Amino acid sequence: PELAAVALSADAGYFGSTPQACVHYLARQVHALGQAGDVLLLMTVSGNEASLLDAIEAAHERDLIVVALTGHTGGAVAAKMREMDVLVCVPHERPARVREAHTLLIHCLCDGIDVQLLGEQEL
């Protein structure tokens, strides 16, 4: 079965002449595209980007579940998470190691979704 996924973008068209436009570009996309029950997947090393924090607030306003892959302690993102959200902190401070772990986690997540939708494959 098909499973829709949309990559939110930092397209230059979202940036206006004000600094606020740079912060709110992800939240505006979440408001426009997100529906209750959807999942917002975030990947961040520091967990302190204002645009991501704003996107989490927008997701909660629209009743989305937030899955956040972060580095170290999760930063400010960790504080924004709700009970139904999922926070996975990679306990490392080097950005390259955190991103490598995020890549592995995304592959595992995709495999898990495939199993849920399609069942176990015979080897």
Tell where the protein language model's regions lie, with residue ranges:
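Glycine-rich phosphate-binding loops that contact phosphosugars or nucleotide phosphates
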Residues: 1-122
